[in-house]
Amino acid sequence: MIKRVALWQAYLAVGALLTALYVFVDPFAGSGPVINLLGLSPVIAIVVGVRRNRPASQGPWMWFAIGMTLFWLGDLYTYSYPRLFGADVPFPSLGDALYVTVYPALMAGLAMLIRRRNPERDRAGAIDSLIMTLGLALLSWVALIAPYLHDDSLTTLPKLVSIAYPLGDILLLAAAIRLAVDTGKRQPSFYLLTGAIVALLVTDFAYGLVTLQGNYHGQVILDVGWISFYLLWGAAALHPSMRELEQPAPERITRLTPL
């Protein structure tokens, strides 16, 4: 008997195929329309997932849809600008304004999700996430934020925008760690969502490093990291377990602190 392919699996399979075309196959290699289509896909996936799976609270997912829409608009501007104007995208640009506003939208959704997963005060979980976030934030400070602050070639606005990206990533990192140490249920949608956040953070960090070194030339490998972020987030919305993502679970032994 042939097993029926789930919608989220089909979504990932089609996304992987389009990604392969984007990376390896002319004339699709590095194509703006292809990556823009991939960037739009999580927005559609979230809308479809909410309608099909009917989570008890749609608020977090609506914020996620807003954040992904802003990310897609930033991509649309960034990849269309050279074709429309025959020049490199300036920095900072409208695209940067759109990208930076992604962070508060995603954080709003994650904050709502965390509150619903943890209806009782969880001091130990909060302290654990703070400890781990501070450690990784220090790495971001040393590798990215401090070098941008001391870069005399940047004027005030470019410097502020450059710093906004790693600061936004630190906030998302804090939310991802808080999800990882909380008492909520661990379902496939949970792992897909946290995987999406990790993909974004790792790719943004790598992009920041190569940009600081002056070695960024539109490397496709970085685009693959952002595409992974799109697809994993979209799959998290399509998976039926997204209904249970906001549900708390009995106390788990996942603590660093004994509180």
Residue ranges and their predicted role:
Residues 1-259:
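Polytopic alpha-helical membrane-helix bundles and their juxtamembrane interface segments
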